UniProtKB/Swiss-Prot annotation:
Native species: Streptomyces coelicolor (strain ATCC BAA-471 / A3(2) / M145)
Keywords, comma-separated and alphabetical: Lyase, Menaquinone biosynthesis
Phenotype of null mutants: Cells lacking this gene require menaquinone-4 (MK 4) for their growth, and accumulate cyclic DHFL.
Protein name, per record: 1,4-dihydroxy-6-naphtoate synthase
Pathway the protein contributes to: Quinol/quinone metabolism; menaquinone biosynthesis
Family matches, as HAMAP family: MqnD
Lineage: Bacteria, Bacillati, Actinomycetota, Actinomycetes, Kitasatosporales
């Protein structure tokens, strides 16, 4: 591994493999080489807090804890509309007051959106929060081990297969109350890489996104290799939902959404407050 190689971790989900395919396979001229580790977002959040690797895909929820050492890239992440986490239940109109809810992580953006939704809509609050691996949540709700489950990503397209009902869409609630897109996943890189390297990396990520859009079939082998037996049509839906203009560039609305989420979460005591320049790049 050359000194120029960056160690990166992102998830095996189709949006990440689609975005990074060209970059990971040396098809972006002048870009740094990548040494890729696949890890779920709960793992990468922990890596960020421990200062591991050079570049990570993390939850926006972890940013307030790590931005002293890590810079938020203005591209490569996941924001969008109509793509928020869902709360699923066995019964169509379940009351979640005092009920047990399974979540994939307590340091995820989905969890922040859920807590903000619950603060607005569940008088007295929900009951016990149980953290469990993402793939176990829908079966646990179906089997009555928990009263409700918070799910993300492809579960939007598959929850009916488990006989479950959508109680609420966290993204709809967020969009309705703020008018902003839903911040989900961020790309961060070590500030110690220095401004020139960070800028070069951001340019390379943007080029990788554009390459994937220009020739979607080129990324398909990489996407499907890591898509955990996902139906190709579901993988395409997943990419269509999570890879969008905010992936190429956060822009004004993207930054407003991130700052809005983290400011509101800080006001609820869920995360530390952000400094005024915390989101600046590089």
């Amino acid at each position: 591994m050359s000194a120029d190689t960056l160690q990166i971790a992102y998830s095996p989900c189709p949006n990440d493999t689609f975005v990074f395919d060209a970059l990971a396979h040396g098809r972006v001229p002048g870009a740094p080489a990548l040494d890729v580790t696949f890890a779920d977002i709960d793992i990468t959040n922990g890596m960020a807090e421990r200062g591991e690797l050079d570049v990570l895909k993390v939850s926006y929820a972890v940013l307030p804890y790590v931005l002293d050492d890590w810079a938020l890239l203005p591209c490569g992440g996941a924001l969008g509309r109509g793509c928020g986490p869902l709360v699923l239940t066995r019964e169509a109109d379940a009351d979640l007051r005092g009920r047990t809810v399974a979540v994939p992580s307590e340091t995820s953006t989905a969890y922040l959106l859920f807590r903000l939704w619950a603060a607005d809509t569940v008088p007295g609050g929900v009951g016990e929060i149980v953290v469990m691996p993402f793939h176990e949540i829908m079966p646990a709700v179906r089997d009555g081990k928990v009263d409700a489950g918070l799910v993300i990503h492809e579960a939007r397209f598959t929850y009916q297969n488990y006989g479950l009902h959508k109680l609420a869409d966290m993204g709809e609630h967020w969009e309705h109350t703020t008018g902003l897109p839903i911040p989900l996943g961020a790309i961060i890189a070590r500030r110690s890489l220095g401004a020139p390297a960070l800028t070069r990396l951001a340019d390379a990520v943007r080029a990788s996104v554009r390459a994937a859009w220009d020739d979607p079939e080129a990324s398909r082998p990489y996407v499907m290799e890591h898509a955990q037996e996902m139906d190709p049509a579901v993988a395409d839906q997943h990419i269509g939902l999570y890879v969008n203009e905010f992936t190429a560039d956060l822009g004004e609305d993207g930054y407003a959404a991130i700052r809005g989420l983290l400011t509101r979460a800080a006001a609820e005591g869920l995360v530390p407050a952000l400094g005024p320049d915390a989101l600046a790049f590089p």
